[in-house]
Every structure is written in C-alpha cells, then in structure tokens.
From Swiss-Prot:
Enzyme class (EC, first level): transferase
CDD domains cross-referenced by the UniProt entry: PRTases_typeI
Protein name according to UniProt: Orotate phosphoribosyltransferase
Residue sites binding 5-phospho-alpha-D-ribose 1-diphosphate per the record: K90, E113, D114, I115, I116, T117, T118, G119, G120, S121
Cross-referenced Gene3D superfamilies: 3.40.50.2020
Subunit structure as annotated in this protein's UniProt entry: Homodimer.
Family stated for the protein in its record: Belongs to the purine/pyrimidine phosphoribosyltransferase family. PyrE subfamily.
Source organism (scientific name): Sulfurovum sp. (strain NBC37-1)
Pfam families documented for this protein: Pribosyltran
InterPro entries: OPRT (IPR023031), Orotate_PRibTrfase_bac (IPR006273), PRibTrfase_dom (IPR000836), PRTase-like (IPR029057)
Domain of life: Bacteria
Positions bound to orotate: T117, R145
Pathway info: Pyrimidine metabolism; UMP biosynthesis via de novo pathway; UMP from orotate: step 1/2
NCBIfam families: pyrE_Therm
Length: 201
C-alpha cells in the first residue's frame, strides 16, 4: 500500500507554509483527521498496521490512545486487532484514564496515535497506563514524522525522540519534512506568513 498516496488522495498531506506546535515552520503538514474522516480508509490503514504488529509476535489485550488526536486511530487499530479500545485524557501534568476506563495489572497495552512526531504524548499516555500496573508492549501510529525509529524503517532515532528504545514502535510510513526555526525559515525570508494548521482550520 502506498500510504503517502492515501494521505494525498484524502487531502491530508498539505503543502504551504505552516507553523507547527513546536514553534518551528515547515512547507508540508500531515492532517491525519482528513484521512480518518473516511472509515474505509481508516480501516485500510489500521488493518495494515495490525498485520505488522501480528507479524512481529506482539501480544496485546487493549489499545490505548491519547485524546483527542489518537482516539479514532486507536479505536480502529483495536478493531483490526480484535481487542478493546480505551483512551487517556490530559490533566495538569501528564494524562489519566477517566470515564470509567480501567486496566488490570499486567494487561498488555499498545499506545496508538494518528501521528508520532517526538512521541511526547504517547510517552505520557504510557506513563499513565503503567502507573496503574499495566504493561506497554508497543507504540503504534499511522504516520511517523521521522524523529523516532519504527520497526522496519530506515530512519535512525533522533535525539528529540521521547519513546523508550526497548519498546517497539510500529508505523506505516516515515514522513520526514524539513523544519526550520522562524529565524532560519526560507519561506519567511521570502515574505510568506506561516499559518497554524490543525484543530482550528
């Protein structure tokens, strides 16, 4: 499957001048919400991700996603794997289970996101789950922004990657875009103004 083409077909791979959450700028942006608005495309992607996880012998009881961005991807991956789906939500520091969700000691959990950049949110989700006695057996995402090394990927982990090195990370594709500080951004130097994509438009 050509994952990049699936994103392009769904208008989920944007080109322009973007202000990222990190404060850096980029000429490309992944908007996974656009690819996930089509249940058939979401199923296609998570079925492929589930197959990778199975092929690597990962046993899992539950998929847990950080809200909000990971919820649909996590739910669909759980469906593809035939297990239950839960999510954690932000609190003042870190994340927590709410809404009556529970995990058991030793329960095998995969943390799933739509996109993993440095893995910061996924790591906070893992810490919340492991504090309750469950075991995180893998991290997964549809797309990897290239800071973390995925199973089968050619990219090496960069210093910004927050995922633990001893837990496998599965993703369908590496999307490595150039990022610039505002001071070094060539688009800014040409007079362009960065726009903030994501939840507000």
């Amino acid at each position: 499957m050509n994952v990049e083409q699936v994103y392009k077909d769904a208008n989920a791979l944007l080109e322009g001048h973007f202000l990222l959450a990190s404060g850096n700028h980029s000429s490309r942006y992944l908007q996974s919400a656009k690819v996930l608005e089509y249940p058939q495309k979401a199923s296609l992607l998570t079925d492929a991700l589930a197959e990778m996880i199975r092929e690597n012998g990962i046993e899992v009881d539950t998929v847990c996603a950080p809200a909000l961005g990971g919820v649909i991807a996590g739910y669909e991956l759980a469906r593809s794997l035939g297990v239950r789906s839960i999510f954690v939500e932000k609190k003042e520091s870190g994340m927590e289970l709410r809404r009556g969700f529970e995990v058991s000691p030793g329960e095998k959990i995969i943390i799933c996101e739509d996109i993993i950049t440095t893995g910061g949110s996924a790591l906070k989700a893992a810490e919340a789950i492991e504090a309750l006695g469950a075991k995180v057996v893998a991290f997964a995402s549809l797309a990897n922004r290239g800071f973390c090394k995925r199973v089968g990927g050619s990219n090496e982990a960069k210093s910004e990657c927050k995922l633990p090195k001893d837990v496998p990370f599965f993703a369908l594709e590496d999307f490595t875009f150039e990022m610039y500080t505002p001071e070094e951004c060539p688009m800014c130097k040409e007079g362009s103004t960065a726009i903030k994509p994501g939840s507000k438009g």
